[in-house]
Swiss-Prot record:
The keyword Ligase does not apply. This is Ovomucoid. Residues 4-54 form the Kazal-like domain. One of its GO terms (molecular function) is serine-type endopeptidase inhibitor activity. Pfam families: Kazal_1.
């Protein structure tokens, strides 16, 4: 199972790097930072489906 360490999030701003991740909500996130911020916002209900686009 793919995992991402989001322990040092949320961050106020994300870099514009493009390394897509697919969330359990079937949404493609541009990078780890935007994904982890969404994980924090979801109170831990969002998880990583896989690396790459959904």
């Amino acid at each position: 199972t793919a995992t991402v360490d989001c322990s040092d999030y949320p961050k106020p701003a994300c870099l514009l790097e493009y390394m897509p991740l697919c969330g359990s909500d079937n949404k493609t996130y541009d990078n780890k930072c935007s994904f982890c911020n969404a994980v924090v916002d979801s109170n831990g209900t969002l998880s990583l489906s896989h690396f790459g686009k959904c």
